[in-house]
């Protein structure tokens, strides 16, 4: 693999959702957010921190991505698998952090990225229009 997971994920999001990573509000290249173009809501946060800050063994830094998972039971199940951590920096149950070191396959991370994108869509976009209100 020539590119880092982060670069590959950024390319995937740009191609799939036409969204580019932003350093705002951090002004630090170690951090970036992915957000919906329409609403500005975040659906992913890339973070580089010392391994110990994530409760991981070893020295040095590691890169992670935090994503929103709608299903609490699923989120709890993921926490029991290697490469998944409780949400960082938000410890709310619906944010899950994935270590970008190859432990979690790239395809799985893309699946969770898609889930996070859907979970953070604007509520008005997600609402189903009742049949009688639809135009015919």
Model-derived segments and spans:
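Charge-dense, helix-prone N-terminal extensions
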Residues: 1-136
